[in-house]
C-alpha cells in the first residue's frame, strides 16, 4: 500500500527497515528527513484531519520553534472521535517554562507525537534506542533548545489505548 502511494506521489518516500523498535524507527526517519518540520504519529494512534495544518498554522502565527496540541485518549471498545472545540485556548512558553510545565503540571507533556517541531531541533539529538517512553529521554533537550513553544488545548491527536500496546505490557 505504502509503495503504491509513493509511486503515485513524489512527496512520499517509503523506507523499508527491519523492526528495531519505536526509537530506532524515529531515528531512521529523522536521518532521512529533508523538510523543514518534524512530526510523529505512533502506529496505533490516529490524528484529526486538520492536525498538521493546525500545528503548522500555530507555529507560523506565533513564530515558534514547536507547536503542540492536546490529545484525547481513545479506547478499543469505544473509539469515539471528539467534536471540534468551538474555540481554543492557546498558551505560549519559553523553553525553560515548558520544561517546568512538563515536570509539574504535565499539561504540555513530553510526548513526541502531539507536536510539530522545526527540524533543526533534532540536528544533534536522537531518541535513545531500546527504551520505553523514549520521548522523555529527549523532551527536556528539545524544549530547552526551542526558543518559544505554542500549545493549543484543541484535542487533535487520538492516543489509542489497547491491552497489547508498549505501555500496557508487563516489563
Give the location of each predicted region:
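Nucleotide-sugar donor-binding/catalytic module of glycosyltransferases
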Residues: 1-171
Amino acid at each position: 500500500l505504502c509503495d503504491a502511494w509513493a509511486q503515485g506521489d513524489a512527496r512520499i518516500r517509503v523506507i523499508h527497515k527491519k523492526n528495531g523498535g519505536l526509537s530506532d524507527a524515529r531515528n531512521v526517519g529523522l536521518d532521512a528527513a529533508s523538510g523543514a518540520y518534524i512530526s510523529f504519529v505512533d502506529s496505533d494512534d490516529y490524528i484529526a484531519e486538520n492536525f498538521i495544518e493546525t500545528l503548522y498554522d500555530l507555529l507560523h502565527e506565533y513564530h515558534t520553534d514547536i507547536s503542540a496540541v492536546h490529545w484525547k485518549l481513545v479506547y478499543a471498545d469505544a473509539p469515539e472521535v471528539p467534536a471540534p472545540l468551538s474555540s481554543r485556548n492557546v498558551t505560549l512558553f519559553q523553553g525553560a517554562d515548558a520544561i517546568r510545565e512538563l515536570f509539574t503540571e504535565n499539561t504540555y507533556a513530553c510526548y513526541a507525537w502531539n507536536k510539530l517541531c522545526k527540524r533543526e531541533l533534532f540536528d544533534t539529538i536522537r531518541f535513545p534506542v531500546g527504551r520505553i517512553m523514549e520521548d522523555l529521554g529527549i523532551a527536556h533537550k528539545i524544549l530547552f533548545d526551542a526558543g518559544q513553544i505554542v500549545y493549543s488545548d484543541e484535542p487533535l491527536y487520538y492516543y489509542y489505548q489497547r491491552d497489547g500496546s508498549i505501555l500496557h505490557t508487563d516489563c
